[in-house]
């Protein structure tokens, strides 16, 4: 049975929605869930839901929490915080993975320094599978590493390649580096220095990717530093919500529009589902020894349940084993600088 530690005190709607998500995960997935946080707040929620005797739900008391505004490094000092305690459960082998909607920087710190990085991984990174008309495009890194060297981007490319193959089922994924033009030689110094290193790898490197390629499906993996990636991710999320809202406003303008909307409703609902972060659950910190799933600060019960599902999906693959192998074999010795 898979065991997942959930930080119940992290997120805008903690602990209520987090605990509800844990209940859903236990019911629908059958995993053992450790609800880590203040038992005085968690137990009443379980009792109200009549789930306090559920053997799949175990409360682990952690009276403190890491606030959203706190420096990420504080989590390593706050040893009674829900996030730290959850990380230690994974480190000790008492839990198989971690889910948190809390302070993203603090979750990254726990992933890197408590759960730890896998062999050969210099910097764990965050990869997100963005929808395109043909399937998914992996954008990596989207926030774990804002300042990078060329060697880090090369590792991100291999990590993204492995994610695309092992998790998304894309064979021989096409890899690109995000730049301001498709021609070799375009981009800032980081991109220009990384380009020849990526060419020297055994990856299916296709050159520079432009912003328009992210959602076009012309690349399967697009590499960038975490600063650029995070801006893209948040802008994309905002755009998706704005498009949905604009469509709603236009529908209200006339009877014909409302009638047309009824016919389009199935398609609109599918689009909305693709744009809904709750459906995706969370994004993994790739390269950590065990799954560390970062979910949205506004995560509701559905998002938490799906984040637990994502952790389980990783545990049911050989992702880390294949990642270590790929880092050893796809990057020539001369590129490992």
From Swiss-Prot:
Catalyses which reaction(s): a fatty acyl-[ACP] + phosphate = an acyl phosphate + holo-[ACP]
Enzyme class per UniProt: transferase
Presence of keyword Transmembrane helix: no
GO biological process per UniProt: fatty acid biosynthetic process; phospholipid biosynthetic process
Record flagged with keyword Transferase: yes
Organism: Aquifex aeolicus (strain VF5)
Localization (cell): Cytoplasm
Domain of life assignment: Bacteria
Function comment: Catalyzes the reversible formation of acyl-phosphate (acyl-PO(4)) from acyl-[acyl-carrier-protein] (acyl-ACP). This enzyme utilizes acyl-ACP as fatty acyl donor, but not acyl-CoA.
EC code(s) of this entry: 2.3.1.274
UniProt KW keywords: Cytoplasm, Lipid biosynthesis, Lipid metabolism, Phospholipid biosynthesis, Phospholipid metabolism, Transferase
A single Gene Ontology CC term: cytoplasm
Record text on subunit structure and interactions: Homodimer. Probably interacts with PlsY.
Pathways per UniProt: Lipid metabolism; phospholipid metabolism
Family to which this protein belongs: Belongs to the PlsX family.
Gene3D superfamilies, sorted: Isopropylmalate Dehydrogenase (3.40.718.10)
GO MF entries: phosphate:acyl-[acyl carrier protein] acyltransferase activity
Protein name: Phosphate acyltransferase
UniProt xrefs under InterPro entries: FA_synthesis (IPR003664), Phospholipid_synth_PlsX-like (IPR012281)
